[in-house]
Amino acid sequence: MREILHIQGGQCGNQIGAKFWEVVCAEHGIDPTGRYTGDSDLQLERINVYYNEASCGRFVPRAVLMDLEPGTMDSLRSGPYGQTFRPDNFVFGQSGAGNNWAKGHYTEGAELIDSVLDVVRKEAENCDCLQGFQVCHSLGGGTGSGMGTLLISKIREEYPDRMMLTFSVFPSPKVSDTVVEPYNATLSVHQLVENADECMVLDNEALYDICFRTLKLTTPSFGDLNHLISATMSGVTCCLRFPGQLNSDLRKLAVNLIPFPRLHFFMVGFAPLTSRGSQQYRSLTVPELTQQMWDSKNMMCAADPRHGRYLTASAMFRGKMSTKEVDEQMLNVQNKNSSYFVEWIPNNVKSTVCDIPPTGLKMASTFIGNSTSIQEMFRRVSEQFTAMFRRKAFLHWYTGEGMDEMEFTEAESNMNDLVSEYQQYQDATADEEGDYEDEEEGEYQQEEEY
């Protein structure tokens, strides 16, 4: 019941996805051959959210893996949990997208998309009551961004009422892998605004900082970064997979976090993050978790929540703890930092409590915030986009795949609109009513005081 179908695309998406499955397998006591070796009934009670039980008693992840080149898939398959996945669910091309969004979205990706959709349909038919999809991808490359957004829009057409959650790795401000990242990211955001329900925004630089500053790793690898992401991903869905005192699912999350349909880009955080040697010197308490979780250094994307205001936020606590204490701590945060929350949404922090902590911890918490400061990410990408687009640099790679310049212009203005929407709600106060006519009409029917 309430299954989630996991889809990973491109090199980044597949590497994050692989780490995520390692974490989920460990939490549910599934060994690398797909057999259950755990010690608690709770691990099996709702294991079907992420796993399908095969006739021979093996548990098979509900995962679809796609890429336009075979490399990452091969290393996944030979990795620790490569044998748990259903072999038919690996869908890959041979050509690669060459960091070109147009190749992923219009040419190479479009050729492969039907075979991916076949696998998605097959998995969805296996579900009792599919709750939604979670997609892991990056926005800077070609496959995860171009083909990822193509798949999201196709799934949207076919399953319009299911939740669509994405874990999207944005290009980092200082660390760039590809010159054309701003193009790919802007074209992707243009799609995500329309077709995704909830986007968890991640970026490598913020993750590097956490590894470096907090976890004290001198040379963090992508494996370390992806481990951080997977901890968060597992935290977002723990309520679905384990019993809890205050449960939540993808839809409840969306209802509580999204005040306006386009503003669904969230920053995420995780606590406790401690360096490997120092765990045994701290006892974890709810106040400590809360404090670390709201700390701006803990956010997994390079936007500073102190530069904006929270429209809404959600906290998921895991472990044995008192719900009363959780509620008190959450109120405490809101009261002490009231200037960082918009006052026209009272009680805008939701908390959920799940009894089972992650492997190796007594308690932990996951934070998801809808903050107006996320516009910093979009603004930064947009500036880089404009600088190149003004000179039409690199455009021939995209127009050569049949794209039109118009599409770039549209994507650019959609992203700029998004930035100004965030800004408008950051500046809005409870008593002044401006012209919000671009929002759904009928939401504010009071006289304007401009």
UniProtKB/Swiss-Prot annotation:
Localisation: Cytoplasm, Cytoskeleton
Keywords: Cytoplasm, Cytoskeleton, GTP-binding, Magnesium, Metal-binding, Microtubule, Nucleotide-binding
Cofactor needs: Mg(2+)
Residues covered by region (Disordered): 420-450
Compositionally biased residues, Acidic residues: 429-450
Membership in a protein family: Belongs to the tubulin family.
Subunit-structure text: Dimer of alpha and beta chains. A typical microtubule is a hollow water-filled tube with an outer diameter of 25 nm and an inner diameter of 15 nM. Alpha-beta heterodimers associate head-to-tail to form protofilaments running lengthwise along the microtubule wall with the beta-tubulin subunit facing the microtubule plus end conferring a structural polarity. Microtubules usually have 13 protofilaments but different protofilament numbers can be found in some organisms and specialized cells.
Record's miscellaneous remark: There are nine genes coding for beta-tubulin. The sequences coded by genes 2 and 3 are identical.
Protein name: Tubulin beta-2 chain
Source species of the chain: Arabidopsis thaliana (Mouse-ear cress)
